[in-house]
Amino acid sequence: MSMTLVAEHYTKIIATKLLETLSSNVSRKGFVEGNPCFERVVQFIEENVKRSISLEQLAELALMSPRSLYTMFEKHTGTTPMNYIRNRKLECVRACLSNPTTNIRSITEVALDYGFLHLGRFAEKYRSTFGELPSDTLSLHKMKCIDSRESSLSSLF
């Protein structure tokens, strides 16, 4: 009977050591500034900001569990991975609407281009993030373009 207990004890020790060496646990070292995993995930988001990105894709890219990914994002950004992606998309939409060199046909087109399929929710999130509607941003952009054209024309005369 004591040999059975010893065998069980050693089996548990070996199993524990094997689990500690799995690649899924490697990424659990502390999340520090300049974390290459975090930087790789953020770079992927930036390069694919117009696409639909899943939590599972990001976790696989970071070589960690979705829960560990959440923890890493909370530490670095103060928000969840999906909120971070949505906020980056909103910032890109705002940049498009504010850019005087961008030829914008409609806000709907820009929103859809960045993956916002429900326009009501898009407008609500945009307003809660920036304090104005997308149409307000576009109107300000158009007014700035008109003002800059008028000032450049008046400088010619």
From Swiss-Prot:
PROSITE patterns: HTH_ARAC_FAMILY_1, HTH_ARAC_FAMILY_2. This is XylDLEGF operon transcriptional activator 2. One of its GO terms (molecular function) is DNA-binding transcription factor activity. Residues 56-77, 107-130 bind DNA. InterPro entries: AraC_XylS_family_regulators, Homeodomain-like_sf, HTH_AraC, HTH_AraC-typ_CS. The keyword tRNA processing does not apply. GO terms for cellular component: cytoplasm. Pfam families: HTH_18. Residues 39-140 form the HTH araC/xylS-type domain. Its main location: cytoplasm. Regulatory protein of the TOL plasmid xyl operons. XylS activates the xylXYZLTEGFJQKIH operon required for the degradation of toluene, m-xylene and p-xylene. It is found in: Cytoplasm. GO terms for biological process: catabolic process; positive regulation of metabolic process. Keywords: Activator, Aromatic hydrocarbons catabolism, Cytoplasm, DNA-binding, Plasmid, Transcription, Transcription regulation. The lineage of its organism: Bacteria, Pseudomonadati, Pseudomonadota, Gammaproteobacteria, Pseudomonadales.
